[in-house]
Amino acid sequence: MKKPLRWLAALTVLLLPLSALAQQQGLTIDIVGGSASATPIAVIPMPYQGSGTAPQTDVSAVVGADLDRSGQFRTLPAAQIVEKPTRGTEVQFQTWRTLKQNYIVVGRVMNAGEGAYRVEYELFDVAKGERMLGLAMTARANAMRDVSHQMADAIYEKITGVRGAFWTRIAYVTASGKGGAMRYALMVADSDGYNPQTIVRSAEPLLSPNWSPDGKKLAYVSFERGNSSIYLQDIATGARELVSSFRGINGAPSFSPDGRRLALALSRSGNPEIYVMDLGSKQLTQLTNHFGIDTEPTWAPDGGSIYFTSDRGGRPQIYQVAASGGSANRVTFQGNYNATASVSFDGKKIAVAQGSGNTYRIAMMDRSLGSPSWSTLSPGSLDESPSFAPNASMVLYAAREGGRGVLYAVSSDARVRQRLVLADGDVREPAWGPYRTAH
């Protein structure tokens, strides 16, 4: 299969060969790139200071790993942590100045009773010797990783001014077996690959997962009925609804920012076009009508327009059309292949799969300063399906390595990349979920 057809693969099921894997395994992270210019921060081990059984989760390790993979921070290696304060009054700031640390995080874990734990932690500016943050959180043992991610989010936001996105989830598709024995699974996991959860299994391909804005549902494409169909599924209950099973292609679902509508690509009238479905009434509005192939819709953050991939100009490029329909405007002009757009929360950045020759990389168009500027985020050579983190600090994407599918997350400044892989298999179709809300 020629690579320029990959932008249509989700619709035509021209899938690359998939290798065997163990579906029950979670993703594991391997940091493959870093940045010497990242901000130094010491995350001190947080001991259990209570009676009874200590929690299995190493809170400080999770916090440190989160900060490291953001690309913005560089945690002090454990071997260089010469003192282990657990509260601010024990911090000798000169020690950490000598170690050239900008910030230090200290804390402790205590028994909160009835199977719960309390974590108290503080963040200090080392140069000033001042406390920047001091919080306490309580959770049951099975929620300690969630608490750790929330701590990392708070630290990240306090220092950078940008909301952290560690306490989020990702969706992806795995496959097992070969030939006619292939089995597929739509999975959801924490953003660091832990706590994988199977949403649906199928003997037929599963494609294009897309999160509802409240993070409670996934829209996806399934071929279990023979033809492509679009389902909505509740992640917590497993309840699902068939919303599109028209003749021909039913593909590339995308929730609107208010969660009330679904953009999708349909060929019910012959040619793949962009439609919007009202999820309450199931009424369809056709947005495009062109002899070219229009697919892969994704909403602008304000809900007023939709970006999509089209070859109407001869090669795949990104276009934009009003959510009510009308004429479409071309958005991308650099390169002769740009597809599968993901738009940042503020609408200023668009990540795409960009092709040049036989190499396909993840690139980003940034309009923050007005005129678009481009940067390359991945090395290639078969990279696709970019998906922004909700704070746009990182981009999740799919790649091929050694004949199998892997996922990478790269910081939006391309300073750090992390590989997320299954130990023995194939993983594709990534989608980064929205912010989560504590209950």
Curated annotation (Swiss-Prot):
Signal peptide start-end: 1-22
Entries under Pfam families matching the protein: PD40, TolB_N
Chief location of this protein within or outside the cell: periplasm
Subcellular location, record wording: Periplasm
The keyword Nucleus belongs to this UniProt entry's keyword annotation: no
GO term, biological process aspect, one: cell division
Key words of the record: Cell cycle, Cell division, Periplasm, Signal
One GO CC term, this protein: periplasmic space
InterPro entries assigned to the protein according to its UniProt record, in alphabetical order: 6-blade_b-propeller_TolB-like, PD40, Tol-Pal_TolB, TolB_N
Subunit structure: The Tol-Pal system is composed of five core proteins: the inner membrane proteins TolA, TolQ and TolR, the periplasmic protein TolB and the outer membrane protein Pal. They form a network linking the inner and outer membranes and the peptidoglycan layer.
Function according to Swiss-Prot or TrEMBL: Part of the Tol-Pal system, which plays a role in outer membrane invagination during cell division and is important for maintaining outer membrane integrity.
UniProt similarity note: Belongs to the TolB family.
NCBIfam families to which the protein is assigned, alphabetical: propeller_TolB (TIGR02800)
Record protein name field: Tol-Pal system protein TolB
